[in-house]
């Protein structure tokens, strides 16, 4: 099954908003074996919407449109599709009742503009909007687009994503008899080119129905293994064979085979081992602490964080010796060790992670170029167990992400070794 995604909105074409909806939809479609052939951004002009949707329906069996279903004058998608299909509109009573209940809970009445949110194109299968007011619509288009489907959803990301999960994906799955298996392999600290070089022979030998996608990101690359066919048993067996071969080659670099962040995996490991952690940060400016505390329940294992940007703060808050700072400079392995030990002592945690470096774009020297990172990990009762100096490329923002990821990856490896030694 082939699909196209159309995102409606002048704000997308002006660069005022990033089109995140299309990426989310494409990922969800890929997971059920639906191929996306085009992703298009379209203006709010009715003629443009009609022309764009007409062209898409001529190429794809399913066209998903987001945006233009709201209550304002620039929300023209519904009227444009009415014109394209030659249909009228009706009030969807169930959607209207939900709007009434939502407004009553706020002590407000339903305005004419809000009522319009429950008006749908004739012949629509209504997609419930569990997060907002604008009803979604699933349309069997009829001639000249017989057996082609048009799906209309709001442009608000949280509303669109809920509709995809609750209405669109179940519908599209029912149209397909094919079986698809997907396994993500999550990797940080190693780039796409290096991983690809390790997997050349495996890719050359892969069955035609199995694909390997490389999804590079700031801190590394994720792999997605996808297999498709008509027999579940055969597809699953073929898929697992390829995954096993890849894991045999690069498995030590893979921190997870499910959709989960590195910090979430570390959190799970800390919970299993009943350990706690604290961080002392200079160049990462609190990003490490933020990544830990982005996870619900992190208070169980995350003790505290220190952001010590100046030399005085490193001395005052963590007890880094003045002599060490003078002799080696703030960006040095010696200072990273002092920060980790001070953090361990002040926090009482089982582990302390420390970062100091030069994120740029200024501050580099021949001896300590831009992108230099010094980091250390200290363990209660064991002192400093990891201390490294590396140089990383990128913008200031990219380096901060890569710096924090480098430390987290090192911490993950340390925890993994400890788990293995206790088995």
Swiss-Prot record:
PANTHER family given in the database record: NICOTINAMIDE-NUCLEOTIDE AMIDOHYDROLASE PNCC (PTHR13939), NMN AMIDOHYDROLASE-LIKE PROTEIN YFAY (PTHR13939:SF0)
Domain of life the protein comes from: Bacteria
Signal peptide limits: none
Similarity remark: Belongs to the CinA family.
SMART domains, per database record: MoCF_biosynth
Lineage of the organism: Bacteria, Pseudomonadati, Chlorobiota, Chlorobiia, Chlorobiales
Pfam families the UniProt entry points to: CinA, CinA_KH, MoCF_biosynth
Alphabetical list of CDD domains matching this protein: cinA
Protein name (Swiss-Prot/TrEMBL): CinA-like protein
Classification via HAMAP family: CinA_B
Alphabetized SUPFAM superfamilies for the sequence: CinA-like, Molybdenum cofactor biosynthesis proteins
UniProt source species: Chlorobium chlorochromatii (strain CaD3)
